[in-house]
């Protein structure tokens, strides 16, 4: 019995080290926005949720926010064969919403990194204390954009209308949960589309979404839900852009959309033939960023080739936070 008492402090120390480095206690504040970073180790039971439709532990009930105004997000894919493949995204919303850069590595799924708006878990700009972190266990279910180890990245944008699929034979996921589906299980755009075909999606009726998905192989697609139908618009050039209008019903010719951000991003990518460096991608995001009532909260560039992630908060493009997700070869 004595030997167990001797090793117990060591086991407790190892457990504490795990919590501090690979769990909610690993939460680290990077700036005053605030932006946090956290490594979520182990299983958040998303595969069980897909199978049963039951959330682990307790239902996720995102905090209600005033969503009468649409997000003004911009997402693009730069996919030239002559350079690295990138997905860039601006998330434009309420300035006081804290953000989290979340690393996950689930058993049976791909490792990934994603940005989360923490206000939907009930957090605001105050410091998140050690005993206020229980809701972070649900953060993997609320990715707003992200990239996985296979070089698949996805971002979402609000649109004026959209109706999710309603097949009674399929399980229904919430609008940002399908981003988690793609990050955990898709090794390509083709696989992402196949996954989405097997689930319904339910939107907040005030803010329906569409999505831009890209992969390290140079493929991308805008995914929309119109009239209960899944629509997939694949890239025809080594670049693709999506902002806040439905493309499948009003596809613009070149940079002729009603959205200035779409036109500016499209023209820049066309001029470069989809070949941008990471710094050039951030410069493009800066050029389409916004101030005002719904400013750009974060700009992020996911390098699908190298796994590098560059994050800028509050349009401060002189302060770039750089991280790395280990890439594995796409099968």
Residue ranges and their predicted role:
Residues 5, 14-180, 184-186, 201, ...:
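N-terminal mature-domain region immediately after signal-peptide cleavage
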Residues 9-10:
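Single-pass type I membrane protein transmembrane segment
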Residues 154, 161-289, 294-296:
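A surface/extracellular/periplasmic glyco- and lipid-processing/surface-interacting theme
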């Amino acid at each position: 019995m004595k030997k167990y008492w001797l090793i117990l402090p060591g086991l407790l120390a190892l457990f504490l080290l795990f919590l501090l480095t690979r769990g909610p206690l690993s939460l680290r504040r990077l700036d005053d926005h605030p932006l946090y970073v956290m490594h979520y180790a182990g299983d958040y039971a998303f595969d069980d949720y897909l199978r049963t439709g039951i959330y682990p532990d307790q239902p996720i009930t995102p905090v209600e926010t005033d969503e009468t105004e649409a997000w003004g997000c911009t997402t693009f894919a730069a996919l030239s064969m002559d350079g690295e493949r990138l997905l860039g995204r601006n998330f434009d919303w309420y300035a006081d919403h804290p953000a989290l850069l979340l690393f996950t590595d689930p058993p049976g799924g791909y490792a990934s990194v994603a940005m989360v708006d923490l206000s939907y878990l009930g957090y605001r700009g105050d410091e998140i204390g050690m005993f206020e972190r229980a809701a972070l266990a649900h953060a993997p279910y609320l990715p707003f954009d992200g990239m996985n180890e296979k070089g698949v990245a996805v971002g979402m944008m609000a649109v004026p209308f959209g109706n999710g699929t309603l097949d009674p034979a399929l399980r229904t996921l919430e609008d940002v949960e399908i981003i988690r589906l793609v990050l955990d299980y898709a090794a390509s755009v083709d696989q992402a589309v196949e996954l989405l075909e097997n689930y319904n999606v339910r939107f907040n009726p005030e803010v329906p979404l569409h999505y831009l998905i890209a992969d390290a192989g140079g493929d991308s697609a805008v995914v929309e839900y119109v009239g209960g139908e899944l629509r997939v618009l694949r890239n025809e050039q080594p670049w693709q852009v999506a902002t806040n209008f439905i493309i499948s019903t009003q596809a613009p010719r070149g940079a002729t959309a009603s959205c200035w951000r779409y036109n500016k991003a499209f023209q820049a990518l066309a001029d470069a033939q989809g070949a941008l460096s990471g710094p050039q991608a951030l410069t493009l995001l800066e050029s389409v960023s916004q101030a005002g009532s719904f400013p750009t909260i974060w700009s992020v560039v996911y390098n699908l080739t190298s796994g590098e992630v560059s994050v800028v908060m509050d349009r401060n493009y002189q302060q770039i936070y750089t991280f790395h997700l280990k890439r594995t070869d796409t099968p």
